[in-house]
């Protein structure tokens, strides 16, 4: 059933690439947690090497501004916010250019490079997930002071909470740090992460959140950075990693079912991007892409963050032909397609 829906979506791709439909569900705000897939600039304000607030990042964003989003333009939450009838971009909570009035209709607490496992955030000195929750608590206090208890509580309970996290736990942590490989099997580590995700959902539920979309993992074995390690084997996807992503998604979906059963009044939707992103990767021409093996920025094989800079002479001129912007992150066009799918098939389930 899921695959049929993705294939139907593929056939309509030419019409749906950048047109973001408004979903029938209405939310007063979009509140975002997670990693670089959804970080709109929080890492700009912390001491870490993982930043993207410089050109050519953001070259296709409004006014060509590099905001700290890991893309050439907007990221999925921006398009989702627009599709919900809210703002066309979700502001980062730590950005001093914004205040609580801006955050009342949307706010991002995500930090690029973070993961469910606290050890993942330590690799690049970024915000751990628990810190994102602490900022969310602070936000609630500020919101109540700004709007009053009743209105603020209404926004907190009726908002859509978008959660996208998990890839870094494998690529920056489990497969990079030998001690994790020794301590856990892949299966055990997956359950360890899912337990943390369940605790996180429960934590923000207790703080008043009720409507949440929890994203699964994409086929991260097909990221250009991972393909580069297979350069002498035709730059193939690392199927071992893709199997891990699929298995993780199956386990996470089971946990989502359990949480919906156990937490009274919660509406938790599992948003699985795996099949859609796989279709984009294996049938790029159907979506108007020409290059899926390498990224637009630099050589496209390994550049990310500071290695993806405006002095690199190899950066492509038209990012819309590429699935990936840098070796780890999608282009604005890919983000729009994914957001469109989430709006059409996942968020439409909210009542």
UniProtKB/Swiss-Prot annotation:
Annotated source species: Arabidopsis thaliana
Signal peptide range in chain numbering: 1-25
UniProt-listed InterPro entries: GDSL, GDSL_lipolytic_enzyme, SGNH_hydro_sf, SGNH_plant_lipase-like
Pfam families: Lipase_GDSL
Source organism, top-level taxon: Eukaryota
Protein name, per record: GDSL esterase/lipase At4g26790
Keywords from the named record: Glycoprotein, Hydrolase, Lipid degradation, Lipid metabolism, Secreted, Signal
Location in the cell: Secreted
EC category: hydrolase
Predominant subcellular localization, coarse grouping: secreted
Active-site residue list: 36 (nucleophile), 326, 329
């Amino acid at each position: 059933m899921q695959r049929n829906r993705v294939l139907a979506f593929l056939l309509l791709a030419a019409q749906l690439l950048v047109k973001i439909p408004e979903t029938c569900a209405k939310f007063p705000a979009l509140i975002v947690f997670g990693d670089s897939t959804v970080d709109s600039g929080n890492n700009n304000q912390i001491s870490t090497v993982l930043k993207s607030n410089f050109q050519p990042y953001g070259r296709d964003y409004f006014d060509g501004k590099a905001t700290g989003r890991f893309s050439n333009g907007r990221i999925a939450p921006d398009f989702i916010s627009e599709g919900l009838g809210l703002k066309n971009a979700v502001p980062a909570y730590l950005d001093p250019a914004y205040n609580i009035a801006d955050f009342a209709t949307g706010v991002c607490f995500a930090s690029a490079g973070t993961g469910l496992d606290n050890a993942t955030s330590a690799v690049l000195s970024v915000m751990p997930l628990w810190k994102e929750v602490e900022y969310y608590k602070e936000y609630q206090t500020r919101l109540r002071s700004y709007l009053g208890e009743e209105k603020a509580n209404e926004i907190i309970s009726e908002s859509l909470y978008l959660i996208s996290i998990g890839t870094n736990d494998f690529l920056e942590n489990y497969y990079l740090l030998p001690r994790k490989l020794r301590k856990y099997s892949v299966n055990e580590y997956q359950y360890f992460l899912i337990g943390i995700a369940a605790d996180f959902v429960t934590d923000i539920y207790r703080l008043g959140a009720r409507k949440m979309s929890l994203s699964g993992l994409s086929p991260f074995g097909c990221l250009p950075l991972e393909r580069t390690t297979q350069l002498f084997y035709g730059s193939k996807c690392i199927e071992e990693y893709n199997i891990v992503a699929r298995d993780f998604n199956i386990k996470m979906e089971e946990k989502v079912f359990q949480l919906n059963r156990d937490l009274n009044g919660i509406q938790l939707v599992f948003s699985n991007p795996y099949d859609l992103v796989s279709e984009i990767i294996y049938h790029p021409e159907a979506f108007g892409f020409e290059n899926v093996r390498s990224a637009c920025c630099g050589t496209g094989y390994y550049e990310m963050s500071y290695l993806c800079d405006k002095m690199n002479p190899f950066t492509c001129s038209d990012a819309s032909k590429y699935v990936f912007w840098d070796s780890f992150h999608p282009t604005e066009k890919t983000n729009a397609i994914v957001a469109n799918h989430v709006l059409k098939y996942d968020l439409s389930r909210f009542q």
